[in-house]
């Protein structure tokens, strides 16, 4: 069938139902963007490509539907780097479209030219370049299928002179693969271990959310009366109200989860790669059960046993593996110590809930006094934990929330719980700043009838602040964003107090800047909240305005400068002076 290359490209997108694109317009892909309105594809023209990529990540994580990111070759595409790597470690299937300089000029160092395939080589699960216009639909179809199968971004690189050619082409037919269920022997061995366990624990990861495995993991947990922990930043991987939910592991997570998993003799790590950062000690507890037998279920065989010693590895979809293991359990599975285990789960959770509700402030390490000084300098201001408690009291139960990297969002890791998956959009283990705002925008585009609230510290928010200039237009849906305002890069400042004698280099932000006023200047609502009551009421009104009146609100939550536990206590140490450094050794540069 004869058609243009751009028609073949867009028809392939339509076959896969990919109807949302995020980026900034550029001449290198105008032949296809010209067809987007006719094709039913919405192009979301953000203020910066990096934020556009994170919008795409938020859209797909909230909805489960693939979206695409696209921009001008060269500098437009390089702006996607952080977003693509973020999506890679969030296991988000995305289509990365990278228009390229024309074939006839590649290699000449021409306008907006760079090696785009090499750039993303370690950031995507699959990449391919269109070598022949006749193959454009075939290549695009294969790239999309690999993104789906590998649950990660995949890249198609398209020299711009491929467009506007008439080709005789047969559109490909998408071939869906059944996700693996795990080997029969491995499933049987896992069921045997869990049947004989005296203190089984289930650890749910991102694969449980992505694979829709929460009901299957719940059935397995209830059969065994096993506590269920969730991985770092995966608070939505099990219902928060369930009696067996112990909470998140990792940085500022649930002490109850840490205490319970430390007692495990068998751990079922379901849909998780067991990232080492997710199991670092917390609250002084080195809780990972080193003597326990570990069953790791992951759809990617390369990640099984990569970070932890594993007894049984199962290459499988989390839902299918959980269902198969449940079916193979012995009649007496879970009976050993069942009553004692149930009581311990209940008392441990209750004790932690009481402790968490009473935690108002951050502790100082011996020999340091920053948090004490921070409280004294602003005695009437909220602490980060006070702010998080106020937020929890006003947050709708069905809300989708996002968070950012940084001190104040991380302090809140133990607080939010959810009743279903695809509700918590944390930045993930690549750890980019500037994720909270764009990801929640993407989530709202995907889920118009659901309230959404994004969170960010003021340092991280500054990286994505330009999106305020984009989202006030009438076609953009309303959102709510809370910015924790304490005028500092908090995580780095905590490092400075612990290891660098309060030598604060690059940690201070401008107190004269008001994000609330900036939001107003962009035609949005901007509010400052100075107390818990003000924050609770402002959030409740902002959500109401979002859902009933179509208004976007930015809330500046004014908090004191308390600093939480350092992110990388495991990787930092106090410097030692040997040769010494003096400003007198600085020499003037010799200019050409």
Regions found by a protein language model. Give the residues of each.
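A general structural motif
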Residues: 2, 48, 108-110, 177-191, ...
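Phosphate/pyrophosphate-binding active-site segments
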Residues: 5, 134, 157, 170, ...
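Active-site nucleophile and cofactor-binding loops and adjacent substrate-binding regions
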Residues: 24-26, 44-54, 69-76, 131-132, ...
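Generic recognition of flexible, low-complexity loop/linker segments
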Residues: 144, 189-191, 255-257, 283, ...
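N-terminal alpha/beta PP-like core and its mobile active-site loop of ThDP/TPP-dependent enzymes
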Residues: 1-332, 369-370, 394, 476-481, ...
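Hydrophobic, well-ordered secondary-structure segments
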Residues: 278, 282-285, 325-342, 347-353, ...
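Thiamine diphosphate
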Residues: 97, 105-107, 111-112, 261, ...
